[in-house]
Amino acid sequence: MAKGTTIRMWRRTTFLLVALNLIGFGAIIVSLIRLQLVDGEKLHTMAVENQTQETSLSAQRGTIYDVNMKPLAKSATVWQVVLEPAFITDKNRDVIASGLSEILGIDKDKILEQSKKKSYYSVLKRGVETDVKDEILKFKSDHKIESGIRLLEDYKRYYPYGAFASTVLGFTGSDSQGLAGVEQKYDSVLTGVSGKLVTAKNAIGTDMPFQYEQKVESKNGDSLVLTIDEVVQHFLEENLAEGVQKNKVGERGGAIVMNVKTGAILGMAVSGAFDPNNPFAISDPTEAAKVASMPQGEERTKELRAAQDKQWRNKMVGDTYHPGSVFKTITGSAAMEEGLVTENTPFNCPDSLTISGQVVHDWKHGGFGHLTFAQGICNSSNVVFMQVGQKLGADRFFKYFDAFGLTQKTGIDLPGEGRSQYYTANNMSILDLSVAAFGQTNSVTPIQMVTAVAAVVNGGYIVQPHVVAQILDDSGNIVKTTDTTPKRQVISNDTSKRMAAILQQNATTGTAKNGYLPGYRVGGKTGTSQKTEVKVKTGKDEYIASYCGFAPADDPQIIMLVYYDEPHGDSYYGSAVAGPTFAKTMEEILPYLGVQRKYTPTELEKLDTSTPDVISKSVADAKNALTKSKLVPKVYGNGKTIISQVPEPGKSIPQNGTVVLFTDDSGSSTDVTVPNLTGMTLANTNKAASNAGINISITGAALTGTNPISNSQSIAAGTKVAPGTVVTVGFIEPDQVG
């Protein structure tokens, strides 16, 4: 080949190689420019995501306190077990699945499946207690597992008092979201704001040094201070449960204790409460057994959900009912405010009235003859109040029905408040009006009713019922205090005072006397309403028995509504069924709240006395001291000096009661048996107690009633006690209605 040809070929090859290199480098430069300027941000994000992990840091849910700062709901530290599938190798996958399955009680195959996800973060189990967390840490250490399992601090809701106040408190779900009660209503306040932790990972999935960590702190939720008083609530729940059992109540009972002047709810209870620590478990044994006996399937699921909804439902806020004769306080206040009646306005009271062709009976066969307006309240005469309703007329009746807040929700800070059902003035017939006047046509919620009656006796003011007094931040500083300013005044202070005085008379000598408490100037009104919807649907007669009372009548502080839905015991009347629960609860609540007794001269004559201390005195001196105290001494033994006495010094004992004195040990072991003291007249009760060698202290209608019958005793029949022991016996007026 010629030399020139070789040189040309070499030059051409060199040029081609240079050109190819230039093109290659150009492409690289273009790619670098594109990566830097066009896709740089996207690729940077991908790189960060591949090397970092973001973990949510839970905020601690705020605490719920009672009015005295006792914690009713709080959050305890638990742990989340989190898998990091991207860092679980085939080598340790089976070891991890086996170990966690044994520790957590989760199916191994489920863990294996979860460990194969294309993810850096997969929650395996929440709410793991610290001892279980420690087991997992030991397992990781024993098997030298550095990545693939994370343990994150979390919080679990805890209710230290169990089922206490559960329909008010509510509960939270597995994700700590409020699902009922205060927990639901104030969920956004209690929840707080989650933080996050961003950490960098190396090639094997373990954390890189601290400088690669970024942390955004969580903000804990605010706390709530309730108006609920734990002591008041316990009194309420215990006595309500006793009343439900005693009266064989079919559809649960409920009660509300409220500050008359501020609307603060001191106690709110519904029988059959659930445990918010385990809210999905059915608390009613009968309901639970019914569900358990059903085969798995749609019907069982439906029954289970119905039972859960029932126990979670707050009847005092969500249910509506005919308030019965308690509503006469509203009709009466309206008529008195309008100047249509005074205490002494006379009414003719046959046993029925015929209205638009419909005969409407009073509760007393034969009627009352003639009653004044005040006597109409104290005798709970339907005939009187049909006439009072007609005096008002539909327009004025509805005007006050609306003014007392009965056409709209109260706005109480609890979820699920029900809506009242009522006739407006335009669609109310004369019959509707007449029957509504004594509480049997329109339907309201218990919280509406107690708020309305509070206005009757507190000077005429509609207050805002509420269960939260304050909101506190994480440091305990006050964020918000509930405004207790009344909404409006619906009747004058004069009308209010006069109505309170009539209602006090009613609790002393009228149909509400089963709620009477000596010294506390109680006022009250009973209610017995027929469940007309049940009658129409089933043909059965079912009733709601209620009692709404307050104290002290001369300066009302506390109001209480007791409500029993379908009582099937000895009576269904509000006075006999709900009155004793009111009296027993208020007798415990009022002294606790510092309400002072003021006795009338008549009450002073009937008061129990305190046993003087005669221990170490001679027999003669002891007898003399007891006689001066209007007590009867009874001596056991042959000694000359008193070595013990029953009742003990300072104990309450009825006037003319017996104090047993021991001069030696010969009689100290001579116990007596408490007899059955219920279902008797006062005279027969005294006789049975005397024959048994015990004393009785009487409460309830025995102090004011005309035909009282004993219905409870503080020490069960058959119990062995020392001679002279005092047994408290409660009395009711069984023929009282309302």
Question: Which ranges hold each PLM region?
Answer:
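Beta-lactam-recognizing serine transpeptidase/beta-lactamase-like catalytic domain environment
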Residues: 73, 202-213, 261-326, 330-562
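Conserved SxxK-family serine transpeptidase/carboxypeptidase catalytic domain
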Residues: 124-140, 150-167, 171, 223, ...
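Ligand-recognition elements built from short beta-strands and adjacent flexible loops
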Residues: 482, 519, 533, 562-738
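Acidic/histidine-enriched alpha-helical segments
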Residues: 110-120, 156, 249-262, 348-352, ...
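Soluble non-cytosolic domains of exported or imported proteins
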Residues: 59, 87-94, 126-130, 176-180, ...
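Residues at or immediately flanking beta-strands
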Residues: 148-150, 223, 252-254, 346, ...
